[in-house]
Amino acid sequence: MRGCFLDISKDDRYLLVGGYHDGRVSLMQLDPVEGTIVGIADGVFHKGMGRCIAERSSRPHVNCVRFTPDQRYVCAVDGGLDQVKLYHMDEDLGKIHNTDILRCQIDSAPKSMRFSDDGRFAYVLCELLNCVNVYRYEERNGEPEFHFLQEITTTDKKDDDICSATAMTISPDGKHLYVVNAGVNSAVIYDIDPETGMLTLNCNSKISGEFPKAVRVFPDNEHFMTLNHENDEICVFKMNYEEHYFLMQGKPLHVGKPNSVAIHKLQQ
């Protein structure tokens, strides 16, 4: 098991691990009181070939794993197979069973997945196609259903060949979706329609950093950070949603090869 992504169930009983190199989805049992790992409850290796058998990236690569908001299913985003594999989650037995496949566009390389705060909409970021796919999520007759709503680009058409959509997050208030692109080194902010879940471009601008690998929004919903892997720094920006621009706040923070980050608001 060589994990690259984690997700924890709402009841703190299970931990999902996504394996990029081995294409494995692992379900770990947790002690909900101590927070320690009890053991491996279940695991599944993805199989198959993707875009081209001559390319290394065509093999299964699990980039992201998520519990659905209702905690009934597991979503495993596989960038090598251009799929999101869907598993039924048996909480009592600690087992996952394949139930369906959400097929993305050919050569899209899905990278990340997020759900809206109300659990009605899902967003899938595609690394090679440089787009966000929007879906309406619901459970029907005991099965998960994802209804495609929208595909929206993360970059200008002229930059497609040098752009790679790398990370995505949603602001704490659920009103905005953020994406960062490597190659063109930009941050893109979208407004989320609360009724339809669809996205509208608010701002697209450079971040003055190389190869952003992560983006996170602070609890005030205005400030956000990018982790710029190639020049060893974290940059903080302030977003102006009404005027459609953001500005850097202070000097970059030097951190060696930053890769991921979590923000936790402390209680006063």
Q: Where do the language-model regions lie?
A:
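Short loop/turn segments immediately following beta-strands, especially the blade-tip
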Residues: 27-38, 88-95, 135-145, 190-197, ...
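Surface-exposed loop and turn segments in beta-propeller and other repeat-based domains
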Residues: 41-57, 101, 147-160, 253-267
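Loop/turn-rich, solvent-exposed surfaces of beta-rich toroidal or solenoidal domains
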Residues: 163-196, 204-229
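Asp-box/WD-like beta-propeller blade repeats and closely related beta-sheet repeat scaffolds
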Residues: 1-63
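Conserved beta-strand positions in repeat-built beta-propeller and related beta-rich domains
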Residues: 17-20, 68, 76-79, 116, ...
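Short coil/turn segments that connect the beta-strands within blades of beta-propeller domains
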Residues: 11-13, 70-72, 118-120, 173-175, ...
